[in-house]
Amino acid sequence: MLDMSDVALSVVQRSFTMSVRAESWRDGDLLAADIPVADGSEDRDRSLAVPERISLTVPRRDRGYTWDPGADPDHPLAAYGQQLHISYGVDIGGGDFEWIDRGWFLITETSSDDTTVTVTAQGLLTWVDEAKFVAPFQPSGTLASTIRSLVEPALTVNFDGTLVDRSVPVGMQWDSDRLGGLTEVLDAWAADAYVTEDGVLLVEPVSDDGTPVLSLTDGHGGTVMHWQGSSSRDGAFNCVVAQGEDASGNQLQGVAYDRNSASPFMFGGPFNPLAVPYTYSSPLMTTVDQCRKGAAAKLLQLRRTTSRRLAVTMVPHPGLMAGDIISATGAGLTNAPCAIETLTLPYSPSEMNLTVRVL
């Protein structure tokens, strides 16, 4: 969860007055410090290659300034490298606002009509997604240095200190997909990566552990307005097989079984008495231990889209981010740990929507 003072945390437990501050930057230069945001929203979805997307509605003309970029590539709302820095304000009393930094977003499209301008922006991994290789790329060095080669200088990378770096096997090659290469390295390293609110790519071990940052309840004094659950067998599995090869070309594999007794897909449980595997492979895994760790991490990641999920409608909480662990009471649950998989934060007075996965 993003940093918030105790005062702001208490305010967002009930209806409150909010504001959004949007700045436009390009190549380190501030182009506009106070974009007049009339409406908008922020969407985050951990299952997407670029998880973040925002939409802003801005008056075409405000305070004598035209916010329609037209054909001007240097306009604050043009889509030629302009970035939006978004902060969400909470009125903590006396007209004073506490500003929560929601992050940096790359403008991808701007359109206008007679009265309004609509701006669409996405997370900074868009740079990596767009940048296909102009020639086949052969990684060398280590997993960490390969990630730096894939994303820098577009993004600065920080690595969690608990990750153990290792050499990349020779002979690998990616033909065009830079972001796909990044995903393959992360999978082989049993790691996750996301862009922080500071615009830095943080690489850390895959994990669903953590102390709940917030308790959601529909009871007295709660902030939840509505719960809605869903379940499906589509794409379900009860084990993951990760395949690699050693330096001699011998095929290796590691298997991770879903042995969580609380999981509806538990291996050996009523979901299916037989193994239902999800299989993936990468030459970056060169030992059985690496394959086993990769399989265990992939099992956690895939559960983000196949486990029991709940849709939550609630009073907006600008500190919440995708991946945060919350505690849920309602919809048949009591203090159940859940991970936020998707969220929609309105940039005007409205309700916030979450999709949470029961852990």
For the regions a language model picked out, list residue spans one by one:
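Acidic, small/polar-enriched beta strand-loop surface segments
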Residues: 1-31, 197, 205-350
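A generic structural motif
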Residues: 54-57, 116-122, 200-202, 311-313, ...
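Short, surface-exposed secondary-structure edge patches
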Residues: 70-77, 163, 315-319
